């Protein structure tokens, strides 16, 4: 029995499902999860000492690779000064200034500890600002596990939403309307029916939790125009795509300004940190200035802020995003070419340092299209690549991530492994 198996069996005795986040359990792909012992650059090593090329990077934060020496140094410098204070620090101001500089639509920002906290707080703020209750979200977009966001569409376009998780009361879910991603007609119909009841529309401008699906410019511009017309707050959930698709996030890529933005992952440099921010007039409704309550004991934790601030400084290096985007595109295009050579139906896409792999004829534009991919073939591919020492997301519904440490040699090794994996799939 491998060390991974031993640890997984042991974990299941004291941790529900043996993991602290469901996707880690390998339920989607089968098999035994890899327990990570250490990581460096583009690699990690599991409990059995096997090395893997890592294309998850903690689900996005590790944009400069694992244990970057400058991030490590920044963290080590603050450790001796204290782990947590529950009081303001100068470093909180510095990271807020950096975020506001890099994302111009964010005039003020509040630090929190997780993406779920960021989206949950942004929705409460939007409701407090507008005095409205209805929320609009989109099928396939994941915004954390707050009750009002664990909702799926009802039986008709304009019906009440239904909970997607046990424990979410229908009375909460009914305030959330779920529409199809990238469907402008459905969006216009919803705003025509109840636009003046909508407190906020929350969207991943580049979705990463139904695999990688890009928002179309037409869709995102329609969102911006309709929210402005009806006085609804447009919330871009950039917890995943923020500082991944461009230095200023998806807003910089598309040239669209949100009213509120949720950030996470990269801004913590691998530490538990997230944030929400936006227009000054909206943020002024937060306590202690306004009546919308939000708080957190560990918000702005000095260690997390140190890691995040150094990461934000590193990604501003000249040519950083050009090189990272080119490497990610080389990976995606190379995988598609290897599949094509083997005669395996497959598509790949990339934007910035995110990529998507689909066992389908073309790149999907909605959750419904993603579900038509060959999941069984993806699962086989995942395990073939895992055996080769390449670690992709253990689910056909998750995006992948490249770091600045994924150099040509790493990409070449990945494509060579993929060539063998696709040949096995085609056999």
From Swiss-Prot:
Matches recorded under InterPro entries: 4pyrrol_synth_GluAld_NH2Trfase, Aminotrans_3, Aminotrans_3_PPA_site, PyrdxlP-dep_Trfase, PyrdxlP-dep_Trfase_major, PyrdxlP-dep_Trfase_small
Entry's Gene Ontology cellular component terms: cytoplasm
Reaction catalyzed: (S)-4-amino-5-oxopentanoate = 5-aminolevulinate
Domain of life assignment: Bacteria
Co-factor requirement: pyridoxal 5'-phosphate
GO annotation terms (biological process): protoporphyrinogen IX biosynthetic process
Class in the EC hierarchy, top level: isomerase
Keyword list, A-Z: Cytoplasm, Isomerase, Porphyrin biosynthesis, Pyridoxal phosphate
Compartment(s) of residence: Cytoplasm
Pathway terms, separated by semicolons: Porphyrin-containing compound metabolism; protoporphyrin-IX biosynthesis; 5-aminolevulinate from L-glutamyl-tRNA(Glu): step 2/2
Cross-referenced CDD domains: OAT_like
Chain positions found as N6-(pyridoxal phosphate)lysine: 265
UniProt-listed Enzyme Commission number(s): 5.4.3.8
Pfam family, one: Aminotran_3
Gene Ontology MF terms: glutamate-1-semialdehyde 2,1-aminomutase activity; pyridoxal phosphate binding; transaminase activity
SUPFAM superfamilies xrefs: PLP-dependent transferases (SSF53383)
Subunit structure: Homodimer.
Assigned protein family: Belongs to the class-III pyridoxal-phosphate-dependent aminotransferase family. HemL subfamily.
Protein name, per record: Glutamate-1-semialdehyde 2,1-aminomutase
């Amino acid at each position: 029995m491998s060390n991974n198996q031993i640890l997984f069996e042991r974990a299941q005795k004291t941790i529900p499902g043996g993991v602290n986040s469901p996707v880690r359990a390998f339920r989607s792909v089968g098999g035994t999860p890899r327990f990570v012992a250490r990581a460096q650059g583009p690699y990690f090593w599991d409990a059995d000492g096997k090395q893997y090329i890592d294309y998850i990077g903690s689900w996005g934060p590790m944009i400069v690779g694992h244990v970057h020496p400058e991030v490590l140094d920044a963290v080590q410098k603050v450790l001796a000064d204290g782990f947590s204070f529950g009081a303001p620090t100068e470093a909180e101001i510095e990271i807020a200034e950096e975020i506001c500089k890099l994302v111009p639509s964010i005039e003020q920002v509040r630090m929190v500890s997780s993406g779920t906290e960021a989206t949950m707080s942004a929705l409460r703020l939007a409701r407090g600002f507008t005095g409205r209750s209805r929320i609009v979200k989109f099928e396939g977009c994941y915004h954390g596990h707050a009750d009002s966001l664990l909702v799926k569409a009802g039986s008709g376009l304009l019906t009440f939403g239904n909970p997607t998780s046990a424990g979410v009361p229908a009375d909460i879910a009914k305030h959330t309307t779920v529409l199809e991603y990238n469907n402008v007609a459905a969006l216009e119909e919803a705003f025509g029916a109840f636009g003046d009841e909508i407190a906020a529309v929350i969207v991943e401008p580049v979705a990463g939790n139904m695999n990688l699906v890009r928002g179309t410019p037409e869709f995102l511009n329609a969102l911006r125009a309709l929210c402005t017309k009806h006085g609804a707050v447009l919330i871009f959930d950039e917890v995943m795509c923020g500082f991944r698709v461009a230095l200023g996030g998806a807003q910089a890529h598309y040239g669209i300004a949100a009213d509120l933005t949720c950030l996470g992952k990269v801004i913590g440099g691998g530490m538990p940190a997230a944030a929400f921010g936006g227009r000054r007039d909206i943020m002024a409704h937060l306590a202690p200035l306004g009546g919308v309550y939000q708080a957190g004991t560990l918000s702005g934790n000095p260690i997390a802020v140190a890691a995040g601030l150094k990461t934000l400084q590193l990604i501003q290096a000249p040519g950083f995003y050009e090189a990272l985007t080119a490497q990610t595109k080389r990976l995606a295009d190379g995988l598609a070419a290897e599949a094509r050579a083997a005669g395996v139906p497959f598509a790949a896409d990339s934007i910035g340092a995110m990529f998507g792999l689909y066992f389908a004829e073309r790149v999907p534009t909605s959750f419904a299209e993603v579900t038509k991919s060959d999941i069984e073939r993806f699962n086989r591919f995942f395990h073939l690549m895992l055996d080769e020492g390449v670690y992709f997301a253990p689910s056909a519904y998750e995006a992948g991530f490249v770091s600045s440490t994924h150099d040509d040699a790493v990409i070449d090794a990945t494509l060579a492994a993929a060539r063998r994996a696709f040949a096995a799939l085609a056999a």
